[in-house]
From Swiss-Prot:
This is Gamma-glutamyl phosphate reductase. InterPro entries: Ald_DH/histidinol_DH, Ald_DH_C, Ald_DH_N, Aldehyde_DH_dom, G-glutamylP_reductase_CS, Glu-5-SA_DH, GPR_dom. It comes from Serratia proteamaculans (strain 568). Gene3D superfamilies: Aldehyde Dehydrogenase, Chain A, domain 1, Aldehyde Dehydrogenase, Chain A, domain 2. PROSITE patterns: PROA. Catalyzes the NADPH-dependent reduction of L-glutamate 5-phosphate into L-glutamate 5-semialdehyde and phosphate. The product spontaneously undergoes cyclization to form 1-pyrroline-5-carboxylate. NCBIfam families: PRK00197.1, proA.
Amino acid sequence: MLEQMGKAAKQASWQLAVLSTAKKNQVLSVIADKLEAESEVILQANEQDMEQARASGMSEALLDRLLLTPARLAAIANDVRQVCRLNDPVGHVLDGSLLDSGLKLERRRVPLGVIGVIYEARPNVTIDVASLCLKTGNAVILRGGKETHHTNQATVKVIQQALEQCGLPAAAVQAIESPDRALVNELLRLDRYVDMLIPRGGAGLHKLCREQSTIPVITGGIGVCHTYVDDSVDFDKALTVIENAKIQRPSACNSLETLLVNRNIAAEFLPALSSKMAVVGVTLHAAENAMPMLQDGPATVVAVAAEDYDDEWLSLDLNVALVDDIDQAIDHIRTHGTSHSDAILTRSLSSAEHFVRAVDSSAVYVNASTRFTDGGQFGLGAEVAVSTQKLHARGPMGLDALTTYKWIGYGDDLVRS
């Protein structure tokens, strides 16, 4: 089955690679229109998935990721239209030169070919990934989790109808519908057809892909994100940033999970933090050194467990620990971080610069919320993933990350001497 899908995707990718930008934008516009026209069907399919997820005891954090609402679906359709407005990187000449031999050489962006994406309870990923792949002339094979089975079926059907309406093969966007996990292992070895694999899920999925795939893998998306509060901060401004990073969307991979506070301000800052978090319903998981200043505050507080520092809460929970200085904060991030998004709140330029240089994450912020790590916020349009590795993409992966380049040489019946 996957052999046939891979072959069809590869053949479709050859057609996509030579499409004009106007034609690709036409396809995306039709997809956006059809998402709105078929919204009732898609939302009904999503409700089937939600009912099954609730019955299985899925956590509130994951239920929120799975849920599609009319507003969320409309936003997804608008994201597709935003991709239409983005510059098409395909065909862009990165650099060029005229060599002594007379050969005119240029390096030009081209599609990767066929992308494989494995993801879990995130129905928006189907549309986000498909739109970015189509804009860059790539075919895609999607393998969503069983939690999103009905939603993915409905959305992929809409995309394939749009492709055929525009005279393009439906095989440009395909989904593996069977929940059989053996098919994941088969996909990981489909290197004859698939050029890059992107897993979007938990640590177990990432480990499986790294160990078993014969296809280049881009991993990321696991976000144990930190914010360090320096002793020079304005309390009110710092608390506003912390609140945004934690509660705007707790289930997102760029939400704040661990707060590191400079010991010099702890006696004043932690009670203020407790008051702020109590209002928004955040439970504080306090380190032993922070507990005395939090236990009598209005926020719910429990003792942090050692393993809490290494896991995503994805909920209204926040680890809080005191550090002696910026270097101890950096050491903590190096030990427990996932190279996703980390921030410093400070009024010291030297501290800010030291933090930026020393913290080796895909996104590092000074006096800003970690919630900004997002393709839309970065001006990249919808993102295919957030890469926490260094090759070949890092951070939110927009259009450029779905391309490679080829060398093109022009001569006048030129031969090498």
